[in-house]
Amino acid sequence: MTEVGLRIDVDTFRGTRDGVPRLLQLLDKHQVKGSFFFSVGPDNMGRHLWRLLKPRFLLKMLRSNAASLYGLDILLAGTAWPGKSIGKQLGSLMRDTDSARHEVGLHAWDHHGWQANTGRWDEAELARQTRLGVDALNQILGREVDCSAAAGWRADPLTTQAKEPFGFRYNSDCRGSGLFRPLLQDGRPGTPQIPVNLPTFDEVVGHQVTVDDFNRFLLDQLATPPAQGQHVYTIHAEVEGIVMADQFDALLGEARARGIRFVPLGDLLPSDPTTLPTGRLVRGTLPGREGWLGCKAEA
Protein backbone atom coordinates (compact mmCIF):
# COMPACT_ATOMS: atom_id res chain seq x y z
CA MET A 1 0.00 0.00 0.00
CA THR A 2 1.15 3.53 -0.78
CA GLU A 3 0.65 5.87 2.17
CA VAL A 4 -0.58 9.42 1.51
CA GLY A 5 -0.95 12.02 4.24
CA LEU A 6 -4.50 13.39 4.50
CA ARG A 7 -4.90 16.91 5.88
CA ILE A 8 -8.46 18.15 6.46
CA ASP A 9 -8.83 21.91 6.92
CA VAL A 10 -11.97 23.16 8.67
CA ASP A 11 -12.14 26.90 8.06
CA THR A 12 -15.69 27.97 8.92
CA PHE A 13 -18.78 27.53 11.07
CA ARG A 14 -20.68 25.84 8.24
CA GLY A 15 -17.75 23.60 7.39
CA THR A 16 -17.64 22.43 11.00
CA ARG A 17 -21.41 22.03 11.41
CA ASP A 18 -22.24 20.43 8.07
CA GLY A 19 -18.98 19.21 6.57
CA VAL A 20 -17.29 17.50 9.51
CA PRO A 21 -20.12 15.02 10.31
CA ARG A 22 -20.29 13.99 6.65
CA LEU A 23 -16.52 13.56 6.44
CA LEU A 24 -16.48 11.48 9.62
CA GLN A 25 -19.12 9.24 8.07
CA LEU A 26 -17.22 8.85 4.79
CA LEU A 27 -13.86 8.24 6.43
CA ASP A 28 -15.39 5.62 8.71
CA LYS A 29 -17.03 3.94 5.71
CA HIS A 30 -13.66 3.60 3.98
CA GLN A 31 -11.71 2.89 7.20
CA VAL A 32 -9.54 5.96 6.77
CA LYS A 33 -8.01 8.19 9.44
CA GLY A 34 -6.86 11.73 8.74
CA SER A 35 -5.68 14.93 10.39
CA PHE A 36 -8.40 17.51 11.09
CA PHE A 37 -7.27 21.10 11.68
CA PHE A 38 -9.97 23.27 13.22
CA SER A 39 -10.56 27.01 13.27
CA VAL A 40 -11.95 27.64 16.74
CA GLY A 41 -12.64 31.37 17.13
CA PRO A 42 -14.90 33.79 15.23
CA ASP A 43 -15.97 32.94 11.68
CA ASN A 44 -15.13 36.12 9.78
CA MET A 45 -14.46 34.50 6.42
CA GLY A 46 -16.87 36.82 4.60
CA ARG A 47 -14.42 39.66 5.17
CA HIS A 48 -12.36 38.22 2.32
CA LEU A 49 -14.90 39.83 -0.04
CA TRP A 50 -12.74 42.95 -0.31
CA ARG A 51 -10.15 40.78 -2.04
CA LEU A 52 -12.50 40.60 -5.05
CA LEU A 53 -10.86 43.89 -6.00
CA LYS A 54 -7.70 41.87 -6.69
CA PRO A 55 -7.86 40.37 -10.20
CA ARG A 56 -6.24 37.03 -9.28
CA PHE A 57 -8.61 36.43 -6.37
CA LEU A 58 -11.65 37.45 -8.43
CA LEU A 59 -10.58 35.09 -11.22
CA LYS A 60 -10.21 32.24 -8.74
CA MET A 61 -13.68 32.89 -7.29
CA LEU A 62 -15.25 32.95 -10.75
CA ARG A 63 -13.31 29.92 -11.94
CA SER A 64 -14.33 27.75 -8.99
CA ASN A 65 -17.93 29.09 -8.94
CA ALA A 66 -17.40 30.03 -5.30
CA ALA A 67 -21.02 30.96 -4.51
CA SER A 68 -22.26 27.45 -5.24
CA LEU A 69 -19.12 25.73 -3.97
CA TYR A 70 -18.96 27.42 -0.55
CA GLY A 71 -22.47 28.85 -0.04
CA LEU A 72 -23.50 32.43 0.62
CA ASP A 73 -23.44 31.96 4.40
CA ILE A 74 -19.69 31.29 4.22
CA LEU A 75 -19.01 34.07 1.73
CA LEU A 76 -20.85 36.62 3.91
CA ALA A 77 -19.84 35.39 7.39
CA GLY A 78 -18.70 38.16 9.70
CA THR A 79 -19.45 41.00 7.27
CA ALA A 80 -22.73 42.64 8.34
CA TRP A 81 -22.81 40.91 11.73
CA PRO A 82 -20.26 39.55 14.23
CA GLY A 83 -18.79 36.21 13.23
CA LYS A 84 -20.12 33.18 15.09
CA SER A 85 -17.81 31.54 17.63
CA ILE A 86 -17.04 28.16 16.07
CA GLY A 87 -15.47 26.48 19.08
CA LYS A 88 -18.06 27.64 21.62
CA GLN A 89 -21.03 26.52 19.53
CA LEU A 90 -19.62 23.46 17.77
CA GLY A 91 -16.94 22.13 20.10
CA SER A 92 -18.82 18.85 20.45
CA LEU A 93 -18.06 18.05 16.80
CA MET A 94 -14.36 18.57 17.47
CA ARG A 95 -14.60 16.14 20.37
CA ASP A 96 -16.46 13.68 18.13
CA THR A 97 -13.57 13.86 15.68
CA ASP A 98 -11.06 13.24 18.44
CA SER A 99 -13.12 10.33 19.81
CA ALA A 100 -13.16 8.77 16.33
CA ARG A 101 -9.36 8.58 16.66
CA HIS A 102 -8.55 11.09 13.97
CA GLU A 103 -5.64 13.42 14.57
CA VAL A 104 -6.89 16.84 15.71
CA GLY A 105 -4.86 20.03 15.55
CA LEU A 106 -5.16 23.80 15.40
CA HIS A 107 -5.84 25.58 12.13
CA ALA A 108 -6.42 29.09 13.48
CA TRP A 109 -8.16 31.16 16.10
CA ASP A 110 -9.54 33.53 13.43
CA HIS A 111 -8.93 32.06 9.96
CA HIS A 112 -9.64 35.33 8.18
CA GLY A 113 -7.50 37.28 10.62
CA TRP A 114 -4.53 34.96 10.19
CA GLN A 115 -4.76 34.82 6.42
CA ALA A 116 -5.23 38.58 6.03
CA ASN A 117 -2.77 39.86 8.63
CA THR A 118 0.04 37.34 9.06
CA GLY A 119 2.30 39.32 6.76
CA ARG A 120 2.22 42.40 9.01
CA TRP A 121 1.80 40.98 12.52
CA ASP A 122 4.90 40.97 14.71
CA GLU A 123 6.13 37.88 16.53
CA ALA A 124 4.24 38.77 19.72
CA GLU A 125 0.90 39.04 17.90
CA LEU A 126 1.52 35.82 15.97
CA ALA A 127 2.19 34.06 19.27
CA ARG A 128 -0.90 35.64 20.87
CA GLN A 129 -3.14 34.46 18.04
CA THR A 130 -1.69 30.97 18.29
CA ARG A 131 -2.17 30.97 22.07
CA LEU A 132 -5.84 31.95 21.71
CA GLY A 133 -6.42 29.00 19.40
CA VAL A 134 -4.40 26.51 21.40
CA ASP A 135 -6.08 27.41 24.69
CA ALA A 136 -9.56 27.18 23.14
CA LEU A 137 -8.92 23.82 21.48
CA ASN A 138 -7.23 22.43 24.59
CA GLN A 139 -10.33 23.33 26.60
CA ILE A 140 -12.66 21.81 24.01
CA LEU A 141 -10.77 18.52 23.81
CA GLY A 142 -9.76 18.30 27.45
CA ARG A 143 -6.15 17.67 26.50
CA GLU A 144 -3.18 19.45 24.96
CA VAL A 145 -3.09 19.87 21.20
CA ASP A 146 0.21 18.75 19.68
CA CYS A 147 0.03 19.76 16.00
CA SER A 148 -1.01 22.70 13.85
CA ALA A 149 -1.49 23.76 10.23
CA ALA A 150 -1.37 27.44 9.29
CA ALA A 151 -4.52 28.89 7.74
CA GLY A 152 -4.06 29.42 4.01
CA TRP A 153 -0.43 28.24 4.36
CA ARG A 154 0.37 31.79 5.47
CA ALA A 155 3.69 31.15 7.17
CA ASP A 156 7.23 32.50 6.97
CA PRO A 157 10.36 32.58 9.19
CA LEU A 158 8.63 34.84 11.73
CA THR A 159 5.59 32.58 12.16
CA THR A 160 7.93 29.59 12.45
CA GLN A 161 9.76 31.36 15.26
CA ALA A 162 6.52 32.46 16.98
CA LYS A 163 5.08 28.92 17.03
CA GLU A 164 8.25 27.22 18.28
CA PRO A 165 7.59 27.73 22.05
CA PHE A 166 4.30 25.79 21.80
CA GLY A 167 6.16 22.49 21.54
CA PHE A 168 4.05 21.00 18.76
CA ARG A 169 4.99 17.54 17.52
CA TYR A 170 4.82 18.92 14.00
CA ASN A 171 3.42 21.79 11.93
CA SER A 172 2.01 21.70 8.40
CA ASP A 173 2.45 25.32 7.41
CA CYS A 174 3.85 25.25 3.89
CA ARG A 175 3.84 23.79 0.40
CA GLY A 176 6.55 21.57 -1.03
CA SER A 177 7.74 17.96 -1.03
CA GLY A 178 9.36 16.10 1.82
CA LEU A 179 9.36 16.52 5.60
CA PHE A 180 12.01 18.83 7.05
CA ARG A 181 13.04 20.85 10.08
CA PRO A 182 12.98 24.60 9.37
CA LEU A 183 15.94 26.61 10.54
CA LEU A 184 15.15 29.14 13.27
CA GLN A 185 16.62 32.63 13.61
CA ASP A 186 19.55 31.32 15.66
CA GLY A 187 20.32 28.58 13.16
CA ARG A 188 18.85 25.72 15.18
CA PRO A 189 16.40 23.32 13.51
CA GLY A 190 12.83 23.84 14.66
CA THR A 191 9.65 21.77 14.88
CA PRO A 192 9.24 19.34 11.95
CA GLN A 193 7.23 20.62 9.01
CA ILE A 194 5.00 18.35 6.90
CA PRO A 195 4.48 20.27 3.63
CA VAL A 196 1.55 19.73 1.29
CA ASN A 197 2.68 18.90 -2.24
CA LEU A 198 -0.59 18.05 -4.04
CA PRO A 199 -2.98 20.72 -5.39
CA THR A 200 -6.32 21.35 -3.72
CA PHE A 201 -9.66 21.18 -5.54
CA ASP A 202 -10.04 24.95 -5.86
CA GLU A 203 -6.49 25.44 -7.14
CA VAL A 204 -6.98 23.43 -10.33
CA VAL A 205 -10.70 23.14 -11.10
CA GLY A 206 -11.84 25.54 -13.80
CA HIS A 207 -8.54 26.17 -15.54
CA GLN A 208 -6.54 22.93 -15.37
CA VAL A 209 -9.26 20.30 -14.99
CA THR A 210 -13.07 20.06 -14.92
CA VAL A 211 -15.05 19.12 -11.84
CA ASP A 212 -15.94 15.75 -13.34
CA ASP A 213 -12.31 14.96 -14.16
CA PHE A 214 -10.84 16.03 -10.83
CA ASN A 215 -10.72 12.55 -9.25
CA ARG A 216 -8.95 11.11 -12.27
CA PHE A 217 -6.53 14.04 -12.24
CA LEU A 218 -5.73 13.54 -8.55
CA LEU A 219 -5.35 9.76 -8.84
CA ASP A 220 -2.89 10.31 -11.69
CA GLN A 221 -0.95 12.66 -9.41
CA LEU A 222 -0.93 10.04 -6.66
CA ALA A 223 0.44 7.45 -9.08
CA THR A 224 3.47 9.66 -9.76
CA PRO A 225 6.13 9.62 -6.99
CA PRO A 226 6.70 13.04 -5.38
CA ALA A 227 10.01 14.87 -5.69
CA GLN A 228 10.81 13.89 -2.09
CA GLY A 229 9.14 11.89 0.65
CA GLN A 230 5.47 11.01 0.42
CA HIS A 231 2.42 12.70 -1.04
CA VAL A 232 0.39 14.96 1.25
CA TYR A 233 -3.12 16.00 0.19
CA THR A 234 -5.42 18.66 1.65
CA ILE A 235 -9.22 18.68 1.51
CA HIS A 236 -11.61 21.23 2.99
CA ALA A 237 -14.69 20.45 5.07
CA GLU A 238 -16.49 23.21 3.18
CA VAL A 239 -15.89 21.48 -0.17
CA GLU A 240 -15.32 17.73 0.14
CA GLY A 241 -17.57 17.56 3.20
CA ILE A 242 -20.55 19.33 1.62
CA VAL A 243 -21.04 20.00 -2.09
CA MET A 244 -18.34 17.58 -3.31
CA ALA A 245 -18.96 14.86 -0.71
CA ASP A 246 -20.16 12.25 -3.21
CA GLN A 247 -17.11 12.83 -5.37
CA PHE A 248 -14.82 12.50 -2.34
CA ASP A 249 -16.61 9.26 -1.43
CA ALA A 250 -15.80 7.93 -4.90
CA LEU A 251 -12.19 9.10 -4.60
CA LEU A 252 -11.70 7.20 -1.34
CA GLY A 253 -13.06 4.03 -2.89
CA GLU A 254 -10.97 4.29 -6.05
CA ALA A 255 -7.81 5.14 -4.11
CA ARG A 256 -8.21 2.08 -1.93
CA ALA A 257 -8.74 -0.10 -5.03
CA ARG A 258 -5.45 1.24 -6.39
CA GLY A 259 -3.54 0.41 -3.22
CA ILE A 260 -3.48 3.96 -1.84
CA ARG A 261 -3.94 4.36 1.91
CA PHE A 262 -4.66 7.78 3.38
CA VAL A 263 -3.12 8.32 6.84
CA PRO A 264 -2.88 11.12 9.44
CA LEU A 265 0.06 13.43 8.89
CA GLY A 266 1.64 12.37 12.16
CA ASP A 267 2.03 8.85 10.78
CA LEU A 268 4.53 10.22 8.26
CA LEU A 269 6.97 11.32 10.97
CA PRO A 270 10.03 9.10 11.49
CA SER A 271 10.54 7.53 14.90
CA ASP A 272 13.41 9.97 15.40
CA PRO A 273 12.44 13.38 13.95
CA THR A 274 15.99 14.67 14.45
CA THR A 275 16.97 12.56 11.44
CA LEU A 276 14.91 14.81 9.15
CA PRO A 277 16.89 17.15 6.89
CA THR A 278 16.93 20.87 7.59
CA GLY A 279 15.47 23.47 5.28
CA ARG A 280 13.95 26.92 5.23
CA LEU A 281 10.33 28.04 5.28
CA VAL A 282 10.03 31.11 3.07
CA ARG A 283 7.35 33.14 1.32
CA GLY A 284 6.50 32.08 -2.22
CA THR A 285 3.65 31.80 -4.70
CA LEU A 286 1.74 28.91 -6.21
CA PRO A 287 -0.33 28.66 -9.42
CA GLY A 288 -4.05 28.75 -8.66
CA ARG A 289 -3.64 30.45 -5.27
CA GLU A 290 -3.87 34.20 -4.77
CA GLY A 291 -1.20 35.96 -2.75
CA TRP A 292 1.85 34.62 -0.96
CA LEU A 293 2.14 31.44 1.08
CA GLY A 294 4.78 29.47 2.94
CA CYS A 295 7.03 27.31 0.79
CA LYS A 296 9.81 24.86 1.53
CA ALA A 297 13.28 25.95 0.42
CA GLU A 298 16.74 24.45 0.67
CA ALA A 299 18.78 25.28 3.77
UniProtKB/Swiss-Prot annotation:
Pathway in which the depicted protein is active: Glycolipid biosynthesis; 4-amino-4-deoxy-alpha-L-arabinose undecaprenyl phosphate biosynthesis; 4-amino-4-deoxy-alpha-L-arabinose undecaprenyl phosphate from UDP-4-deoxy-4-formamido-beta-L-arabinose and undecaprenyl phosphate: step 2/2; Bacterial outer membrane biogenesis; lipopolysaccharide biosynthesis
Catalytic reaction annotation: 4-deoxy-4-formamido-alpha-L-arabinopyranosyl di-trans,octa-cis-undecaprenyl phosphate + H2O = 4-amino-4-deoxy-alpha-L-arabinopyranosyl di-trans,octa-cis-undecaprenyl phosphate + formate
UniProt EC number: 3.5.1.n3
GO CC aspect terms: membrane
Class in the EC hierarchy, top level: hydrolase
Keyword tRNA-binding: no
UniProt GO MF annotations: hydrolase activity, acting on carbon-nitrogen (but not peptide) bonds, in linear amides
Occurrences of domain NodB homology (ranges): 2-263
Keywords: Antibiotic resistance, Hydrolase, Lipid A biosynthesis, Lipid biosynthesis, Lipid metabolism, Lipopolysaccharide biosynthesis
One biological process term in Gene Ontology: lipopolysaccharide biosynthetic process
Transmembrane segments annotated in the record for this chain: none
PROSITE patterns linked to this entry: NODB (PS51677)
Stored InterPro entries: ArnD, Glyco_hydro/deAcase_b/a-brl, NODB_dom
Top-rank lineage group of the source organism: Bacteria
Protein function: Catalyzes the deformylation of 4-deoxy-4-formamido-L-arabinose-phosphoundecaprenol to 4-amino-4-deoxy-L-arabinose-phosphoundecaprenol. The modified arabinose is attached to lipid A and is required for resistance to polymyxin and cationic antimicrobial peptides.
Similarity section: Belongs to the polysaccharide deacetylase family. ArnD deformylase subfamily.
HAMAP family hit by this protein: ArnD (MF_01870)
Protein name listed in UniProt: Probable 4-deoxy-4-formamido-L-arabinose-phosphoundecaprenol deformylase ArnD
GN (gene name): arnD
